[in-house]
Structures are given as structure tokens and as C-alpha cells.
Design a protein with these regions (language model features):
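Single conserved hydrophobic/aromatic residue that forms the stacking wall/gate
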Residues: 1-9, 14
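A conserved segment at the C-terminal end of the G1
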Residues: 15-26
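NTP-dependent small-molecule kinase module
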Residues: 18, 105-106, 124, 144-148, ...
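Conserved catalytic segments around the Walker B and adjacent sensor/switch elements
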Residues: 25-33
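Conserved nucleotide-sensing/catalytic segment adjacent to the nucleotide-binding pocket
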Residues: 30, 39-91
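Receiver (REC) domain switch/active-site residues of two-component response regulators
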Residues: 35, 127, 179
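ATP-dependent NMP and nucleoside kinases share a basic, alpha-helical "lid"
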Residues: 96-150
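Anionic, Ser/Thr-rich low-complexity intrinsically disordered regions
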Residues: 137, 154-162
Length: 209
């Protein structure tokens, strides 16, 4: 699951948690968050004095900002039946990544979401891919909400412009790899109905008695 403004991708993952709780199958679903694979740049943030100053000179909007090879390795380990420890990235503005943080057990279903989930180094790890296409005005609104939460200050405009330009190169072309493309501005009821259909298929294929 990926989109260039992850709110709807996150909504899909929230819905999968509801499904897991409803059918008491949480152990049958493993979640691997792409954003947790950002490299640790905490020392660079400290040297810059703040995350907003750091972000002016470090590009977080390219696949090279993440250790996607490690993500692919972890998914392959899970698929081979191995217990794996996943990293956890602090999104509060410290740029700290805690390695070997989250215990992940092999399961029938592995779900991942994030900006770079369908890029070259990890896309082949997934059997089924969903791209959520977000209108430009909605993406911009969501970005500035997050920018305020992360205290980006006067760096926000530059970061948004850079993110939009890089998305045109690294993210939007990934739509071609998706099995299904969803409209991120679709009616929520229709959107949830679609998710319920996907979940019904998962239930039938993987959890039918």
C-alpha cells in the first residue's frame, strides 16, 4: 500500500487492525512500516540545531534516504518463516532509528505502507499492491498539518516544493506497478466498502475453516 500523502494508506492499515481484532487473528497479520527504514540521522539533526534546519540540507524525499535493502531482507526472512526484529523510526523530529526494536513473527499476511513501498528495491517482495492517488490540493493540506506537528517552521515551503518534485520522479511512476489504483478523495463510504471487499477475500482465502 502506498500513496504520496499516506493518510489513506494509513486508513487501510487501521481497517486491517479492526479486521484482525474482529476475527481474533492479529497473530496472522504482520505489519512492516516502510517509514521505519529511514536511516538514523540524529547526529546530523543535533549538529544542525533542529530538525527544520537539518531538513533544509538533507533530502528525505528520495528512496536513498531509506535502507530499503534491509526492509526487503526482513520481508524475505518473514516469508521464509524466521522471527525478525524490525527497526522503529522516531517521526517526532529527532531522526533517531532504533534498530532491532519490534519483534515480528512470520504470518500468512504481511502488510506494508509508506511513500516508497512500491519503489524498485522492495516492490517485488509483495504479491498484491495498492496505490492511493491523492489530489494535489489534499496532499498540500495534509502536508502542512504534519509540518506544523513536526515544527518545520520556515522550512515547510521548501520541503513541500522539494517533496512534490521528487514525488514526480520517485513515487508517482510507481502507480504503474500497482494491481489496484484507488482515488484518495473518493467518498469514504465507497472507500470502506472496497476495503471490506478486500478483507472478505483475505478472510476467504486465508482464514476459511
Amino acid at each position: 500500500i502506498r500513496d504520496s500523502s499516506t493518510s489513506r494508506g494509513s486508513e487501510m492499515c487501521i481497517r486491517d487492525r479492526s479486521f484482525a481484532a474482529e476475527f481474533n487473528i492479529d497473530d496472522a497479520i504482520t505489519r512492516v512500516n516502510t517509514d521505519d527504514y529511514y536511516y538514523d540521522r540524529s547526529e546530523m539533526v543535533k549538529a544542525a540545531g533542529s530538525f527544520s534546519e537539518f531538513a533544509k540540507n538533507y533530502d528525505l524525499d528520495v528512496p536513498q534516504a531509506l535502507e530499503l535493502e534491509l526492509m526487503s531482507k526482513h520481508i524475505k526472512e518473514l516469508l521464509s518463516g524466521k522471527i525478525t526484529y524490525l527497526p522503529k523510526y522516531d517521526m517526532s523530529g529527532t531522526a533517531i532509528r532504533h534498530d532491532n526494536y519490534t519483534l515480528a513473527k512470520p504470518s500468512k499476511i504481511i502488510i506494508s505502507e509508506g511513500l516508497f513501498t512500491l519503489t524498485e528495491k522492495v516492490k517485488d517482495a509483495f504479491d498484491f499492491k495498492i496505490y492511493v492517488d491523492i489530489a494535489e490540493d489534499i496532499k498540500k493540506e495534509r502536508f502542512y498539518v504534519r509540518a506544523k506537528e513536526r515544527d518545520l517552521g520556515d522550512s515547510a515551503d521548501y520541503i513541500y516544493k522539494n517533496a512534490n518534485e521528487k514525488a514526480a520522479v520517485h513515487i508517482r511512476p510507481c502507480k504503474a506497478y500497482a494491481d489496484i489504483v484507488l482515488s484518495g478523495s473518493a467518498d469514504r463510504i465507497k472507500y470502506k466498502n472496497f476495503l471490506n471487499r478486500i478483507i472478505a477475500v483475505i478472510q476467504e482465502v486465508y482464514f476459511a475453516e
